[in-house]
Amino acid sequence: MIAQLSTVAPSANYPEFLEALRNSGFRGQISADYATRTVLATDNSIYQRLPQAAVFPLDADDVARVATLMGEPRFQQVKLTPRGGGTGTNGQSLTDGIVVDLSRHMNNILEINVEERWVRVQAGTVKDQLNAALKPHGLFFAPELSTSNRATVGGMINTDASGQGSCTYGKTRDHVLELHSVLLGGERLHSLPIDDAALEQACAAPGRVGEVYRMAREIQETQAELIETTFPKLNRCLTGYDLAHLRDEQGRFNLNSVLCGAEGSLGYVVEAKLNVLPIPKYAVLVNVRYTSFMDALRDANALMAHKPLSIETVDSKVLMLAMKDIVWHSVAEYFPADPERPTLGINLVEFCGDEPAEVNAKVQAFIQHLQSDTSVERLGHTLAEGAEAVTRVYTMRKRSVGLLGNVEGEVRPQPFVEDTAVPPEQLADYIADFRALLDGYGLAYGMFGHVDAGVLHVRPALDMKDPVQAALVKPISDAVAALTKRYGGLLWGEHGKGLRSEYVPEYFGELYPALQRLKGAFDPHNQLNPGKICTPLGSAEGLTPVDGVTLRGDLDRTIDERVWQDFPSAVHCNGNGACYNYDPNDAMCPSWKATRERQHSPKGRASLMREWLRLQGEANIDVLAAARNKVSWLKGLPARLRNNRARNQGQEDFSHEVYDAMAGCLACKSCAGQCPIKVNVPDFRSRFLELYHGRYQRPLRDYLIGSLEFTIPYLAHAPGLYNAVMGSKWVSQLLADKVGMVDSPLISRFNFQATLTRCRVGMATVPALRELTPAQRERSIVLVQDAFTRYFETPLLSAFIDLAHRLGHRVFLAPYSANGKPLHVQGFLGAFAKAAIRNATQLKALADCGVPLVGLDPAMTLVYRQEYQKVPGLEGCPKVLLPQEWLMDVLPEQAPAAPGSFRLMAHCTEKTNVPASTRQWEQVFARLGLKLVTEATGCCGMSGTYGHEARNQETSRTIFEQSWATKLDKDGEPLATGYSCRSQVKRMTERKMRHPLEVVLQYAQR
């Protein structure tokens, strides 16, 4: 049995601060629970710092309430750090104080001025969210990031983020027109470029605002020569406290130059007015392939002479990982493989403009250069033409940061020297020395980045659980800092300083005290994100050294090796945050999108699972043994009931917090398919539930869900009685109140036997299949039944049989056998294993007869390919085809059918775990002369039985309204492949959606 787990309480003074904040009128959430703190202890870096608490302001007034309290003498020891998307690679948002998360509520687009091309947004607005709102106006916010679907504008400002296209579009700072910030003590600062008269007024202002203006002006006037010689002339100039740009090109004084990139160490940016640009109307991406990565780098200078928008580079390691990723099927055509001459580097060279003729002329001139120049060895090039094609390739490039974390084994590329910048003309030589440095340590590495800007993301591969390898972080950081300085570059070229700030004093030299004085004017007691960039002059506290912070690996290594090897997807989550994608029309992750609570995301759940495993180990519990050595249900009942009573009486147990996070998971498996690291939450969720309910008694609801597949065949003998009982108001109310189940489906009252007779359907038995001749086997299939389409949607099962019959195939019906998916979802893993072994044995015997197996519902069918393969003792399971996979082999081309357009709204599990599936449906329809377009959708909110659980009603509806509800009434009939999706639409709208099979049956010729 697992242990009851106590947790670390917040340190002294923090509970008092939080109580004072509650009493101040703060309207957002205040969370000091261990789950929230654990999830916010990591970002996309190698570090882990447990905060004391987290606060989620509702608006700028809430931020001011926090800052006002901070200014009181009694709370001078309280530290605060802002957090946006949590995508930083250097620990910028990590703290052992309080996290101020601006992303949950302060994420509104306040104003769009199309004529003057500017927007006003709150700090928590996600970059892609902003660009989606701007797109109808033909505008966009320019700085392009690989994390743009979860990075917030506030985070971009705080790190002065840049990325692809920065040589053309500049950095975030170049697009900031005005900022609204809250300073320590609660004062508001409205900063924008001002002339000297306005500067005099600002310096004369009372309080902290006047103080910071006076200090900034003094530094700018007295240190001008030192500033000029210290700040490098690079596209990626120094971020944070950028004294070199306190005066802009028009001579105006702009305090935003020091606020951009300050990482929240000077104040809290709550709102920004931003410059936006017209979207280029036409784009072409030239994808150039090389025989070596160094050739790709050395070629960059010559390519830049053609003035492209940008040049992005990717090495072979990243390219090989991309080939195994969900995204590859959409871009493979642009990177043809040649086994004799493998591609070891690529440059993605973009040209864009408003006139296709002008863009194409530039592209042709560029191609002529490629064909005539022999200075490097190129393998060839391809063109991605138009916005849609260019976006597909860039999506692959954007996933590089996550893909590098998905190498096999424990030695994985780590971010700690990954954003160095040098003059572009020095890049190839610099990288040669960088590679020699890493080669000297015997390390592998992956590289990608912005060669036009002289920035390459380099991630040395280390097993951070190995203390010997983890100890290399400091000497490598020291060596790379020295190397960049030798080449006239920067250690911090793009991702901010964060916990690499110890190199700041050496770099700034005599100018560093000026930074300290500026910090002191904003934050005299070092309370705002302390230890980063600089400390106030005279402060006893220093900068946090690279090796002075707990590493994630330091804690991971305390987990028993057998345990972390058995839970790889939880341990290997690297925090890239792809699951924080804001887009409601992206499948991953529906519970995060609906709640905006980070523990309800794959990253959050992986963090909690990792910490739970660690704490169980500290309590001397072997979770693997606990899973193996389960006591009988009856024997363990008294202990479970005692533990339930203790839980209800308020006994602390971190397991309850983990359970709450796992219970919120829809088990849609989008994370297993979409996450670059392939974090599979449903897998370790089921294992956790099994262990948790070894200590705590399950609710009756779990048993009803788990047994559904086994009981429904018997209940189906009396469908009228079952439907009358389940459809009655008093039974529905009883189930909702006492069991926690709502909107239970009713059994189909359909004459299935008539279909079986009409289409001469036989039972699939080994003797029956062996009697078939080879020719007959080629024209036969075995239909594998699932509980949902068989008993709750029988007309669809009948439609498939009719379709197969029309196509000249005889259907054999596999004997009904419980698939086991509901058991797996609820954590009944012992019962699931028995069902899987029994079912797989039966299916293997049938498959050995040489007749293909086909299943209807994607979520149920894919269990045979995924969950079954992990069952101990199960020697494989034959592949059960999805309907479209089978139709691709048997459906002939025919004359165009009647005109009509259809839209496919695919099941989350299907489209994320079998990416080719939606394209296959499109091809099936094309063979009938029909047009089918795959609709971009998120989750429908049902996901099996999730939407039927009373505790999930509100979230289920929210998820449905975020995406599916907005798509149903567009032109073209919507079609859904998932039983649960069709059920949700019917429940929410009283509308019946068809399965694509029903349309194929309608139009397929006899």
UniProtKB/Swiss-Prot annotation:
Q: What happens when the gene is disrupted?
A: Deletion mutant cannot grow on D-lysine as a sole carbon source and shows attenuated growth on L-lysine. Mutant accumulates D-2-hydroxyglutarate.
The record's top EC class is oxidoreductase
Q: Name one GO molecular function term.
A: FAD binding
Q: How is the cofactor bound?
A: Binds 1 [4Fe-4S] cluster.
| A Pfam family hit | FAD-oxidase_C
Cofactor needs: [4Fe-4S] cluster; FAD
Residues given in the record as [4Fe-4S] cluster binding sites: C665, C668, C671, C675
Q: Which residues form the 4Fe-4S ferredoxin-type domain?
A: 655-687
**Would the keyword Metal-binding be found if you checked this record's keyword annotation?**
yes
Q: Does the keyword Cell cycle apply?
A: no
Q: Write out the entry's keywords from A to Z.
A: 4Fe-4S, FAD, Flavoprotein, Iron, Iron-sulfur, Metal-binding, Oxidoreductase
Give the binding site residues for (R)-2-hydroxyglutarate: R397, H495
Q: What does its record list under induction? A: Up-regulated when grown on L-lysine, D-lysine or 2-aminoadipate.
- Which GO biological process categories is it annotated with? lactate catabolic process
Kindly state which reaction or reactions the protein catalyses: (R)-2-hydroxyglutarate + A = 2-oxoglutarate + AH2
Q: Which PROSITE patterns match?
A: 4FE4S_FER_1, FAD_PCMH
Q: What is its EC number?
A: 1.1.99.39
Domain of life from the UniProt record: Bacteria
Q: In which pathway does it act?
A: Amino-acid degradation
Q: Which ranges carry the FAD-binding PCMH-type domain?
A: 47-279
The record's function comment reads:
Catalyzes the oxidation of D-2-hydroxyglutarate (D-2-HGA) to 2-oxoglutarate. Is involved in a D-lysine catabolic pathway.
The entry's family comment says:
In the N-terminal section; belongs to the FAD-binding oxidoreductase/transferase type 4 family.
Put simply, this protein is called: D-2-hydroxyglutarate dehydrogenase
Per the UniProt record, the source organism is Pseudomonas putida (strain ATCC 47054 / DSM 6125 / CFBP 8728 / NCIMB 11950 / KT2440)
Instruction: Report which gene this protein is encoded by.
Output: ydiJ
